[in-house]
Amino acid sequence: MSKQIEFNETARRAMEAGVDKLADAVKVTLGPRGRHVVLAKSFGGPQVTNDGVTIAREIDLEDPYENLGAQLVKSVATKTNDVAGDGTTTATVLAQALVRAGLRNVAAGANPIALGSGISKAADAVSEALLASATPVDDKKAIAQVATVSSRDEQVGELVGEAMTKVGHDGVVTVEESSTLETYLEVTEGVGFDKGFLSAYFVTDFDSQEAVLEDALVLLHRDKISSLPDLLPLLEKVAEAGKPLLIVAEDVEGEALSTLVVNAIRKTLKAVAVKAPFFGDRRKAFLDDLAIVTGGQVVNPDVGLLLREVGLEVLGSARRVVVNKDSTVIVDGGGTAEAIADRVKQIKSEIETTDSDWDREKLQERLAKLAGGVAVIKVGAATETDLKKRKEAVEDAVAAAKAAVEEGIVTGGGAALVQARSAVEKLRGELSGDEALGVDVFASALSAPLYWIATNAGLDGSVVVNKVSELPKGQGFNAATLEFGDLVSAGVVDPAKVTRSAVLNAASVARMILTTETAVVDKPADEDEHGHGHHHGHAH
């Protein structure tokens, strides 16, 4: 396909126009008095949202050069969302301000490389200053405040605070759609995993389509179970004990599965077979976790434990097991608190030593399952459109709360960024030339989020920025009440991680755009065809 090429200022200006279009669409949502954006969907009704990354993802511009700029700023929003789960609008507004001021300086003759270097150094200095000034978060009230600011909804803030408090810092908080109008919290104490029963005949509660086992024994097997002679001796012992049985194995098939099904239909033995989740080493590790939670052993021929020879002593136990077609939850396993604490310690040390992000994430999931249980926030609303919007807000609030627990909180309302200028001024004294100019560009951009929070609240942004820059740390402009004062005690706080991610990602993308000298895009198809039609045999 033929390409079009633009150079120098023309390329940068076109990209800036794209940055502006995307950022202008996103920044109207900033702050407690920000507005909504309506997105047309190719199927279903329109989506109403005030989430920066959701809006950014929908935007593709017609002009290919402008679209390059828009896509680069979109990456700021998505990267910030991936790292911190919130703060996407702040990141977009910062990037726009940096690009605008930076390009002005480049057009006036500044060296873009030195300018970009100054911006990066300033971003690092502000990031460190934010971390240093962050207040740790450990109580329910502070978590609820962060979640309330993120979702603009006190009820959501309370629910997220309660969920995080109940499952602990290592627990899992998920968000699901509720079938009612109510938004409420469900906490599952215990270990859950995403594998359901192997046969619908195991269902004991036909209304909810679940198999519920009370006071159950748990058999954990590393390999497949298919031979009936291997399984039968143990089944007979379990039947004598008169307790229901949960079997978790690589797979249960053939005679073994059909025998369990027949027993379930005849109600002679209540048993449920479930596949162990994951593959390879992760599955082995997870089965070992389950053994510790239930107080049992994993039946494994490699260590001399054969299924046909073992008795009830290798089985774990649980007060309650609930299995549906997609998931299994083991509540109140029979394992000792000491054994579980040791296992948690072991997984934490593995998390610290692993180099792979993927491994770290999976280890954290295992840790959460062991340590805290699972909290589910069920979101309800009157209409489908409202439900989507609320669910998004709750997901952002959960992400913000987790980020706050990780790195602490800073003053909200854009005040922390305006007041972080002192860190930038210190740095400016150490630099000279265009690098120092880059620091100035960054310092001026730091007021952009506060400017737009104030503007969206109907005030003069510049006046508010000047006033906040004179206030002591911890104070700022509360756009919800339109008053200046102590933001921390008023609960207007942001997670340090969210604000830091916004600063670093915005600086990174602004630097890329400032140092761009050439833009190459595909030639529009109709021009191509037009060209081919009239110039047969000519090279393009």
From Swiss-Prot:
Residues 521-540 are annotated as: Disordered. One of its GO terms (biological process) is protein refolding. PROSITE patterns: CHAPERONINS_CPN60 (PS00296). InterPro entries: Chaperonin_Cpn60_CS, Cpn60/GroEL, Cpn60/GroEL/TCP-1, GroEL-like_apical_dom_sf, GROEL-like_equatorial_sf, TCP-1-like_intermed_sf. Its EC number is 5.6.1.7. CDD domains: GroEL (cd03344). Together with its co-chaperonin GroES, plays an essential role in assisting protein folding. The GroEL-GroES system forms a nano-cage that allows encapsulation of the non-native substrate proteins and provides a physical environment optimized to promote and accelerate protein folding. PANTHER family: 60 KDA HEAT SHOCK PROTEIN, MITOCHONDRIAL. This is Chaperonin GroEL 1. It comes from Mycolicibacterium smegmatis (strain ATCC 700084 / mc(2)155) (Mycobacterium smegmatis).
